[in-house]
């Protein structure tokens, strides 16, 4: 006859696992807070740039203009540049190889900023570091 004696211990086994439910609840609340707050941090700010009050620099006898039209066509003076890679060669022809010549850069207001920077980088790669940006003089008189 077998007799089973209870030695006074608990019948429930101890649970050695970590309860992650409160941790998940806190993480979900933080996720929701950041999802709501993130769009507020990326508000577009309208910047109305001031007009320059500086006096216009004297114009050289034969200025060299690089222009970007609204249709994304690039010109050196009145001559269209067939490819952006040929900009340096056309500038060399206009300036007779003088890299110290100031290049006047003008662009239509509808041209993307990235396209402007690409043209500026092409001029810099060709060795033309003196670049003047051309704007409307009437904007400075407001």
From Swiss-Prot:
Task: Please list the residue ranges that the record places on the Cytoplasmic side of the membrane.
Answer: 1-22
Instruction: List, alphabetically, the GO terms of the cellular component aspect.
Output: plasma membrane
**Gene3D superfamilies assigned:** 3.30.420.270
The annotated topology with respect to the bilayer is: Single-pass type II membrane protein
Which ranges does the record mark as transmembrane? 23-43
Which InterPro entries does this one have?
ExbD (IPR003400), TonB_ExbD_1 (IPR014170)
Respond yes or no to whether keyword Cell membrane is given for this record. yes
Periplasmic face residues? 44-142
One GO biological process this protein is involved in is:
protein transport
Q: Does the keyword Transmembrane helix apply?
A: yes
Classify the source by domain of life.
Bacteria
Ordered alphabetically, the record's keywords are:
Cell inner membrane, Cell membrane, Membrane, Protein transport, Transmembrane, Transmembrane helix, Transport
In which compartments does the protein localize?
Answer: Cell inner membrane
List the Gene Ontology MF annotations in alphabetical order: transmembrane transporter activity
Q: Which NCBIfam families match?
A: ExbD_1, PRK11267.1
Q: Subunit structure of this entry?
A: The accessory proteins ExbB and ExbD seem to form a complex with TonB.
Sequence similarity: Belongs to the ExbD/TolR family.
Biological role stated in the UniProt entry: Involved in the TonB-dependent energy-dependent transport of various receptor-bound substrates.
Q: What is this protein called?
A: Biopolymer transport protein ExbD
Q: Which organism is it from?
A: Pseudomonas putida
Gene name for this UniProt entry: exbD
């Amino acid at each position: 006859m077998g007799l089973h004696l209870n030695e006074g211990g608990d019948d429930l086994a101890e649970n050695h696992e970590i309860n992650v439910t409160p941790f998940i609840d806190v993480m979900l609340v933080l996720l929701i807070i950041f999802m709501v707050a993130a769009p507020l941090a990326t508000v577009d700010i309208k910047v109305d740039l001031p007009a320059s009050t500086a006096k216009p620099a004297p114009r050289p006898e034969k200025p060299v203009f690089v222009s970007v039209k609204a249709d994304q066509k690039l010109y050196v003076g009145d001559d269209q540049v067939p490819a952006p890679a040929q900009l340096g060669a056309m500038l060399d022809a206009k300036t007779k190889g003088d890299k110290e010549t100031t290049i006047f850069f003008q662009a239509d207001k509808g041209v993307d900023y990235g396209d402007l920077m690409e043209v500026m980088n092409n001029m810099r790669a060709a060795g033309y570091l003196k670049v003047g940006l051309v704007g409307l003089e009437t904007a400075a008189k407001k």
